[in-house]
């Protein structure tokens, strides 16, 4: 076993997903790479299956944004479950199936930190719809004077000591984090134990929510998201 783990999140299998999984392993020989997914989906062999029962529930968000399945609101759970099932690594990196790369993690990102995300909101605006939904539909919302976001749930890096504290907190006090979109739930968790950081200053040129926000140049070193 290596001392670093890449958690490869996905919800279906086709030739492209298989190629991206294998490419990730090839580019990062010093990391173990393990796939993970929600129960009930066609997943890669050897995948960890996420047990959602011990975590917060975002079902309430579905009533207000019904075009999405509840799992769409909860990809941060993959990181927590990766640690929960595989707690003996020193470093963890969450990588979503619709991300592409052509270099190793260390070649592209600064891993000399205890955490990094992408589109950091430090803190998020109270007028943001996801913050407003949380404030309205979770009676424990006043526990958090400010709400933070770590960005998209891909290319997220944790040192063990930070992820361990996040997992312990989100399980112990899971009802505090119900109806909280993954980006703001994870960001608010992380903010309790360290500062929110980026893996590189120009990361928003590479990682976004929609393809229209990024200019894909395959000839330069990259981690791009989303690329379907």
Where does each model-flagged region fall?
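Short beta-strand-to-loop acidic/aromatic patch adjacent to the donor-nucleotide binding site
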Residues: 89-100
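Conserved glycosyltransferase catalytic-site signature
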Residues: 71-77, 153, 179-187
């Amino acid at each position: 076993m290596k001392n670093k783990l890449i958690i490869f999140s996905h919800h279906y299998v086709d030739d492209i997903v298989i190629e991206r999984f294998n490419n990730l392993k090839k580019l990062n020989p010093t990391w173990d790479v393990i796939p993970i997914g929600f129960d009930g989906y066609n997943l890669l062999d050897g995948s960890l299956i996420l047990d959602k029962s011990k975590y917060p529930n975002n079902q309430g968000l579905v009533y207000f944004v019904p075009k999405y399945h509840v799992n769409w609101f909860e990809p941060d759970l993959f990181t927590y479950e990766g640690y929960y099932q595989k707690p003996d690594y020193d470093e963890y990196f969450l990588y979503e199936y619709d991300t592409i790369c052509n270099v190793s993690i260390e070649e592209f990102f600064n891993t000399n930190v205890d955490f990094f995300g992408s589109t950091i909101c430090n803190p998020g605006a109270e007028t943001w719809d996801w913050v407003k939904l949380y404030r309205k539909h979770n009676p424990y919302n006043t526990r958090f004077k400010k709400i933070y976001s770590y960005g998209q749930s891909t290319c997220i890096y944790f040192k063990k000591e930070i992820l361990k504290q996040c997992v312990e907190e989100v399980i112990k006090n899971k009802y505090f984090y119900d109806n909280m979109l993954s980006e703001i739930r994870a960001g608010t968790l992380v903010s309790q134990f360290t500062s929110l950081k980026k893996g590189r200053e120009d990361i928003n040129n590479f990682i976004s929510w929609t393809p229209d926000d990024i200019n894909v140049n395959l000839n330069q070193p990259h981690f791009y998201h989303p690329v379907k």
